[in-house]
């Protein structure tokens, strides 16, 4: 159990501008990339295969997977990171599990998920 003072400090730090999304959703994560004196936005689009629960507070994170040139790429993002400028939910899929690690072993049509109605 967390200290009340720690909870109070965390409440001020948690970002409220990001949309609500779940495991199984297709998302676009807009990242701020700094290169020397320039700053640009890079978009990482893929399927959310894992997400920590809201009980984690500031340390909440999520994992996004995409296929790039036939190779699976996964990135782990801290949800409250200042590097993330925006998150767009593209499609909500119907899933029955909290962690979709089994998708790593699937390819092609077997890796598809049904869209929520």
Swiss-Prot record:
Superkingdom of the source? Bacteria
Q: Which GO terms describe its molecular function?
A: structural constituent of ribosome
Q: Which InterPro entries match?
A: Ribosomal_bL19 (IPR001857), Ribosomal_bL19_CS (IPR018257), Ribosomal_bL19_sf (IPR038657), Translation_prot_SH3-like_sf (IPR008991)
Q: Does the keyword Coiled coil apply?
A: no
Report the Pfam families cross-referenced here. Ribosomal_L19 (PF01245)
Protein's GO biological process: translation
An annotated GO cellular component of this protein is: cytosolic large ribosomal subunit
Query: Per UniProt, which keywords does this protein have?
Result: Ribonucleoprotein, Ribosomal protein
Q: Where are the transmembrane segments?
A: none
PANTHER family from the entry? LARGE RIBOSOMAL SUBUNIT PROTEIN BL19M, RIBOSOMAL PROTEIN L19
What family is this? Answer: Belongs to the bacterial ribosomal protein bL19 family.
Main function: This protein is located at the 30S-50S ribosomal subunit interface and may play a role in the structure and function of the aminoacyl-tRNA binding site.
HAMAP family this protein is in? Ribosomal_bL19
UniProt-listed NCBIfam families: rplS_bact
Protein known as: Large ribosomal subunit protein bL19
Q: From which organism does this entry originate?
A: Mycoplasmopsis pulmonis (strain UAB CTIP)
């Amino acid at each position: 159990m967390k200290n009340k003072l720690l909870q109070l400090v965390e409440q001020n730090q948690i970002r409220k501008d990001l949309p609500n999304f779940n495991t199984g959703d297709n998302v676009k994560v807009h990242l701020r990339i700094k290169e020397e004196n320039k700053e640009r936005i890079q978009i990482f689009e893929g399927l959310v295969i894992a997400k920590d629960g809201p009980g984690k507070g500031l340390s909440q994170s999520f994992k996004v997977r995409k296929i790039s040139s036939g190779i699976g790429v996964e990135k782990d993002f801290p949800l409250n990171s200042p590097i993330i400028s925006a998150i767009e939910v593209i499609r909500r899929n119907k899933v029955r599990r909290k962690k979709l690690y089994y998708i790593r072993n699937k390819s092609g049509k077997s890796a598809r998920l049904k869209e929520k109605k």
